[in-house]
Amino acid sequence: MRLIHALLAIALILPVPASATVRVVATLPSLAAIAREVGGPDATVESMLPPNIDPHFADAKPSLVVTLSRADLLVENGLELEVGWLPALVQQSRNAKIATGANGRFDASTVVRRLEVPRGPVDRAQGDVHPGGNPHFLYDPRAGAAVVRALAARLAAIDPTHAAGFQSRAANVASELETFARTETAAFATLPAGHRTVVTYHRSLIYLCDWLGLTSPISVEPRPGVAPDPAHVAKVLAQLKSLPARVILQEEFYPTSTTTTLARLGAAALVSVEGGTRFDKGKRYIDHLRAISTSIRAALAK
């Protein structure tokens, strides 16, 4: 706690540049990549997490408190994806701009279509089920386009001087994402029907499947966030062979021992996708999605 307070004190005495831009902090690298494109030269953007970290279980590092203390706008995924670590960091930052309900707090989940919204009560026996719906919507460029437009409106409200720039850049990015989404949907539709069934490790790729017209009847995890047991692995293998499913999909931060074995025994390809945009490498959000769709289509076409 003393370290956090010391870091905050240093952050608060640092001067703000005369040519100050909106300081945006995004919880996820894909959100940061979106914010960077919309903000352009009128915003500085930081990502709290790299793409190879599972956002469910990120570490609440003291350095992130300092980052949040200086933010004009916090962009979060929402739907409780960051609930295990973000609230404490925001509280410790003592930054009223990014408090819940403040204009400097942008919840991307409020502007997208949600999948897998539970109809009844949710408890831990069901695994890591999110009461508001599946939070992994950033794997769908159609959702990304909605976030782009809404984020531009929020940036314009915070910095009206540069509103025209935010809106113009957002219009271009959103249009590009929507065109890309339609193109890829059409391309996947040309695959034989029997080539469009996949098995996912976690339920995090459901929006991806919805976008690309893929069927995912079973996951390697028996319940979200619960490690596979031998009985469930045997069930998955049986479905791999009977469907058949040609591809097993998983994000890079999940273990591969079980999926590698399943792929070998089930004569399926294992495709590991990036957990988010390589924001630190200067990659664009659409680059991230294009790499994923290209690798999956190539595996399904074999």
Model-identified regions with their sequence ranges:
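Extracytoplasmic metal-acquisition and chelation regions
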Residues: 20-302
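Bacterial N-terminal signal peptides
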Residues: 4-15
